[in-house]
């Protein structure tokens, strides 16, 4: 594996806690993150899988995540959310995920998300095309606070292609949506 990949991962931002909760969809980004943290940190990890229930395959995805965590000896919490039909699916799903994370993650722990460099660029372009002001053009950083919830993004300088290479290197199974 390319040493440059590992040098871009900022684990220093994780040093002030003994427990991490990882947002885990089972997709490529969160699978690579969960595997990487489990392989490189001696810290209690808990994966959090949120079942949106918007696909016929949602239960299969949840089972895949549970099985992956069991095989890798990682704690997992699976939560189901219900998105109201008259609301925007994307914004309502985001709101409910944040609410779920706030309810699950204790204040002594941190939430770790697998946002990567491509997500950062995508967010910037989305905000730019929406006509946001200068302040709105700043994208997310490697650390954030949402009330008492501390969010960590150690992959923020990693490109998607590097994540895919990591998955191939370790032959990790994931969900293809």
Question: Can you describe what each PLM-predicted range is?
Answer:
Residues 1-174:
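Core alpha/beta nucleotide-donor-binding catalytic domains of modification enzymes
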